[in-house]
Amino acid sequence: MINLIKDSGNRREFKTGAVRDMAEGKGRMDLLPWSAIIEVSKHCENGAKKYGEHNVDKGIPTSSLCDSAARHLAKYLAGHTDEDHLLASAWNLLWALEMRNKHPEMVNTPWVDDIADKE
């Protein structure tokens, strides 16, 4: 086990006099919309029941995830209430980001390649 505390050399001091390493660039977890994240986690739970746990971790092309996200968003905007389309859209977009970050081989946006070829 690595027993190392990373240090940027920058400090922030609290009213109490305590100091910590600056958090800039590390992400602000305190700014996340937790009620929405809980909704997404329940959508993950339901998906695990249908497809098995960690099915999406095997890899889904980003084009499929973005297509589904756009379709769900269009249905949400059109007023469809047969399922939570806004939630489903968010889930698909989050997993597209996850594929980009952890499975770059799943990133397949042919329309981007087509545009780049024309420039």
Range-by-range predicted roles:
Residues 1-119:
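Intrinsically disordered, low-complexity regulatory regions
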